[in-house]
């Protein structure tokens, strides 16, 4: 049943998925140098997982072309800090905010058999020496607090709980915070996971239905890139 529903989702979005596959292949060589430079840099860091590197090229394709540009970046789900470090290392003038519980989250989310104290300690050490805003809290609570304080961001990366309900909640709150013409990037939305009660793509699809006149999907493969247009 999981595979059938995912197949139908992919079929419905076949055009954008196909275009996204070609784009990823096309730009791979373009970001080869900066990816290698970043990979060399993180050899001295302590990362047990490097999932983010799978999407490095497409991530940078949508980030500013000028490495000196001043922009605001928020990520939900920082884990050991690899994606945040990528921004801090490659964009010295960026303003980075990270949100993570570094603890057990929604009971419907995929279980992670890790020591979260150790994960948070790695995060702190990996980003040592950089200036950024770290928020340790539930993502929806943190996002609403940022909204109350009138924060806004140019880029928001959603990589927290992959349960569809949480993806939808994070996306709705992120929409309120992202600037017009700003981007929301969703991690790992085109997958089926038997350990999750409601799949990520279901939450993503619902978000797109709610805001269909206010957003534009630019990219959809293993990650999704959405632009806020109004």
Can you describe what each PLM-predicted range is?
Residues 2-21:
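N-terminal auxiliary segments of SAM/dcSAM-dependent transferases
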Residues 6, 29-31, 228-229:
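Positively charged, low-complexity intrinsically disordered regions
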Residues 3, 55-58, 83:
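Conserved alpha-helical elements of sugar-nucleotide-dependent glycosyltransferases
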